[in-house]
Each structure stands twice: as C-alpha cells, then as structure tokens.
C-alpha cells in the first residue's frame, strides 16, 4: 500500500491558471490578464495554486504525503530525465511509494540549457513565450525532426524507462494521460487509466459543471474531479486502502 505519492507532469499537474481570486482585481487594475498571475505575482499566488491542484487534494483525502515535481510546458523528454534524476536519490527498495505520471502530448520536445540550468520546452518556442539566442535554431530543429515515428518512439521510450525503473525499485506506478490517448499515442500498460484528465473535465462540463480556469486548464472543481477519479483508480488496483 502506498504511503507516499510522487507526481510528474506538465501544466495540468503544476496547477496552471489556478489564480487566487484576491489577485484578479489587482491584475486587472494594472492592465494584466488573469493568466499573468504566474509571472507577475508568482510568490503571492503560489500558496493558492499549490493548495487547489489535484496533488494536494490527494494528500488531504488520503492523509499521506504527495510530492509534486511537475513543470509548466513539460514534455515526456523532460519528465523522463527529471524522473531518472529523482530516482537516483531514492533507496533501492521503495515498496510504499506510488508514482503518478500525468503523461502529456508525445510530440512535445524539450531542450536543456546548460547556461540557464533549466529545460526549455517546445510549447514556448511555438507560441513565442521564450527569448533565447538559440530559439531560431531549435525551431528549425523541430520542423525538420518532427515525425509520427519519432513521437511514438518518445512515448515508448518514456513508458519503458519509467516502468523498468519503478519495477527495479519495487515502486507502484500509474499512467494518467492528460489528453485523450488516441490523439497523442497509446500507452500499453496495465497501470494506465482508461480515461484522460481532459476527458474527465469535458464530461463534467457536459453535465453542467464549470470545470475550466482562465485558460485551457482545469479550475479548482476540475482538479477535484481529477483527484476523485485517481483515488477510485488507486482503490480498484488496491494501491491504497
């Protein structure tokens, strides 16, 4: 049974667009959009974002520690490296640890900047949210290297690596795709959820619930629904009591 959970993922796991309502009028008065809270008031909004994302809801509901090691815009490439680095710091035998991989679109790409000591993700390259001397070079690389075969390999490499390391360290794991599986590759594993996080939110939206935040991310209620589905899945697999 899990006594600790660790989450890896992209902006959905990070809690993007979860903004403290008290900051909304401040941002509007200063001429910023609500989505600018992450950059203009990072430290002020941090407690609110962390409290309302699904990982913290899991921690409260299950009464066990949950570490969130996600990053906005992350790719399977970036998540894979972060997981390996984290794994090197763990004991050889971790039977009470459960890892949740909130897998993202397999066509995403990440470059590591040794100078900046951070990952630079293709989403920011494509939408102009990154300023770096090598941006034009990376854009050219993405155009000439993108292919269905490469994307499928990226997903396969991620799944095989993470699964093998979890088995080696006697950890449990879950693959919980953010997007519908058939749209971004399919994971063949007994520990993958039959639903995606976006499926959950769209279904609840059809039922009349307001589940979306300011951008294309779940709001506080959306994160509650995601946590509820994860808990049900964990109980079905007897990963938690």
Regions of interest found by a model, annotated:
Residues 50, 79, 154, 158:
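Short, glycine/acidic-rich beta->alpha junctions
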Residues 1-78, 225:
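Serine-esterase "nucleophile elbow" of acetyl-processing enzymes
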Residues 84-241:
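Alpha-helical cap/lid subdomain in secreted, periplasmic
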Residues 76-86:
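Outer-membrane beta-barrel proteins
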């Amino acid at each position: 049974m899990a006594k600790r959970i660790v989450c890896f993922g992209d902006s959905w796991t990070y809690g993007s667009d979860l903004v403290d309502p008290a900051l909304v009028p401040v941002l509007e008065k200063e001429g910023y959009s609500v989505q600018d809270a992450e950059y203009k008031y990072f430290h002020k909004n941090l407690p609110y974002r962390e409290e309302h994302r699904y990982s913290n809801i899991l921690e409260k509901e299950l009464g066990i520690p949950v570490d969130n090691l996600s990053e906005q815009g992350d790719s399977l490439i970036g998540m894979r490296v972060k997981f390996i680095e984290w794994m090197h710091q763990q004991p050889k035998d971790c039977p009470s640890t459960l890892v949740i991989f909130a897998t993202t679109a397999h066509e995403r790409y990440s470059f590591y900047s040794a100078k900046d000591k951070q990952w630079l993700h293709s989403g920011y390259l494509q939408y102009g949210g990154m300023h770096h001397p090598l941006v034009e070079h990376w854009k050219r690389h993405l155009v000439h290297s993108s292919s269905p075969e490469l994307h499928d390999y990226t997903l396969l490499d991620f799944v095989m690596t993470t699964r093998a390391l979890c088995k080696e360290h006697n950890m449990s794991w879950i693959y919980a795709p953010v997007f519908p599986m058939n749209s971004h590759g399919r994971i063949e594993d007994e520990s993958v959820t039959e639903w995606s996080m976006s499926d959950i939110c769209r279904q609840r939206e059809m039922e009349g619930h307001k589940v979306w935040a300011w951008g294309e991310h779940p709001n506080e209620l959306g994160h509650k629904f995601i946590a509820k589905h994860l808990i049900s899945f964990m109980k079905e697999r007897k990963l938690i009591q």
